[in-house]
Amino acid sequence: MKEYNIVITGVGGQGILTAANLLGWAALKAGYKVRVGEVHGMSQRFGSVIAYVRFGDDVYGAMVPEGKADVILSFEPVEALRYINYLKKGGLVFTNARPIPPVQVSMGLATYPSLEEIKRIVEEEFNGKFLAFDAEKLAIEAGNVITTNVVLIGALTQTPGFPLSAEHVKEVIRLSVPPKAVDVNMKAFDLGVKAAKEMLNL
């Protein structure tokens, strides 16, 4: 496999960089060359954050070029739209459905797009696939809202063409989190897997 490119986005405090590092570590353990990159200086709470995970046999540079992302994994719907130009034609946008309206929306200076609008843009302009579910709700069900990132990673492992096996990624997460957090993270991962299987009719 030449390369597989993931763009992870959301707002500060959602665990985006942790998710990028977990996926990068899983790809490394699977024997791929890996590059993980992030945009610094914007990760204050509620500020826009973007991270890149690139892996394969032939990967150079940490930044995913525009139009080259196989997947945009978004922790917040409008953030997927903000970085939509990274998506390749026929790519996948997988997002947490729960919005965190930007300041401009809160102040009445902008309107927040519906999931239907975002889906239309992904499908019509990028010939892509759009999947959204309430990952935060499942993280709370698992036992801690902070595991939203792990719910999303679990879901990602079920998407068509994703090169890393769910069991492999799950094991890396198990080894990476503190011992007392293993159970809640494993449950979060499994709930993400289940949600994706239901959405994808697997």
Curated annotation (Swiss-Prot):
It is an enzyme of class 1 (oxidoreductase). One of its GO terms (molecular function) is indolepyruvate ferredoxin oxidoreductase activity. Keywords: Oxidoreductase. SUPFAM superfamilies: Pyruvate-ferredoxin oxidoreductase, PFOR, domain III (SSF53323). InterPro entries: Indolepyruvate_Fd_OxRdtase_bsu, IorB_Oxidoreductase, Pyrv/ketoisovalerate_OxRed_cat, Pyrv_flavodox_OxRed_cen. Its EC number is 1.2.7.8. It comes from the Archaea. It catalyses: indole-3-pyruvate + 2 oxidized [2Fe-2S]-[ferredoxin] + CoA = (indol-3-yl)acetyl-CoA + 2 reduced [2Fe-2S]-[ferredoxin] + CO2 + H(+). Catalyzes the ferredoxin-dependent oxidative decarboxylation of arylpyruvates. Heterodimer of the IorA and IorB subunits. This is Indolepyruvate oxidoreductase subunit IorB. It comes from Pyrococcus horikoshii (strain ATCC 700860 / DSM 12428 / JCM 9974 / NBRC 100139 / OT-3). The lineage of its organism: Archaea, Methanobacteriati, Methanobacteriota, Thermococci, Thermococcales.
